[in-house]
Amino acid sequence: MIVCLEVLVIVLMRLAWYLAMVAVTVLALLPIEHLQMPVFDWWDKAQHALAFVVLTSWALLLWPHAAMRVALRMLAYGACLELAQRAVGWRFAEWADLVADAVGVVVAWGLVRWLRSQQSTSIESNSR
């Protein structure tokens, strides 16, 4: 019974992650009417990095044994978003956005590694 509940939680968390990915994709491709963008907008880059920290951290926790694949796929997802933005015509692609996405992936990687090291340290100290 407990195993079934754990599996259900994992399945629901993965479903929620996929829905979050769809939501980010939709938001990234929505037309932005009458938006005057500065040449380089730090807030936009911070939003990219934060979105990728959250999505990548979440994915790394859901698929702990596929960390490198998760990181590479998140980078590919960021590149695909930029290409899609270029293709739709009402958005535009920026290399700086892709760099911000990559920063988010790297920060997530480091954060999850640190959290796991803290968890293993805590388990070791509790077993003594």
Predicted segments with their positions:
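Short helix-capping/hinge motifs at transmembrane helix termini and TM-loop junctions
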Residues: 30-31, 64, 89, 116
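Interfacial helix-loop-helix junctions of multi-pass membrane proteins
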Residues: 34-42, 81-106
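Alpha-helical transmembrane segments of multi-pass membrane proteins
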Residues: 24-28, 74-82, 105, 109
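Membrane-interfacial, low-structure loops and terminal tails that flank and connect transmembrane helices
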Residues: 1-7, 118-128
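Membrane-interfacial alpha-helical segments at the cytosolic side of multi-pass membrane proteins
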Residues: 50-67, 105-116
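"…centered on the first transmembrane helix and the immediately adjacent amphipathic helix/loop
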Residues: 1-60, 74
